[in-house]
């Protein structure tokens, strides 16, 4: 059985990394960084949006900014047809 990560990649998901800057609850003048990483679908990022909605509703640290990077680890350009049989002797 394939891993969940591999199955998601085969369905078009890519690895998404978000740098989330937020104000510390006890010291609102200070920013803290949280790095979040999960497989998600670009460009709408439903998983990331769900996490940020949870953050805004349930956590005390007010969001300041979010920077997102996304990369599909498996994509069509990595596949090519090879004709022939190779024998090792």
Swiss-Prot record:
Pathway: Amino-acid biosynthesis; L-tryptophan biosynthesis
Keyword list, A-Z: Amino-acid biosynthesis, Aromatic amino acid biosynthesis, Tryptophan biosynthesis
Keyword DNA-binding among record annotations: no
InterPro entries named in the record: Usg
Pfam annotation, one family: Usg
Function: Probably necessary for the cotranslation of trpF. It may also function as a subunit or stabilizer of phosphoribosylanthranilate isomerase (trpF).
Name of the molecule in the record: Protein usg
Organism: Caulobacter vibrioides (strain ATCC 19089 / CIP 103742 / CB 15) (Caulobacter crescentus)
Organism lineage: Bacteria, Pseudomonadati, Pseudomonadota, Alphaproteobacteria, Caulobacterales
UniProt gene name: usg
């Amino acid at each position: 059985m394939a891993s969940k990560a591999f199955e998601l990649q085969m369905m078009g998901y890519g690895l998404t990394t978000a740098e989330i800057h937020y104000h510390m609850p006890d010291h609102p003048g200070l920013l803290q960084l949280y790095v979040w990483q999960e497989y998600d679908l670009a460009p709408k990022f439903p998983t990331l949006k769900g996490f940020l909605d949870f953050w805004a509703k349930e956590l005390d640290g007010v969001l300041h900014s979010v920077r997102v990077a996304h990369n599909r680890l498996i994509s069509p350009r990595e596949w090519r047809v090879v004709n022939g049989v190779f024998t090792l002797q």
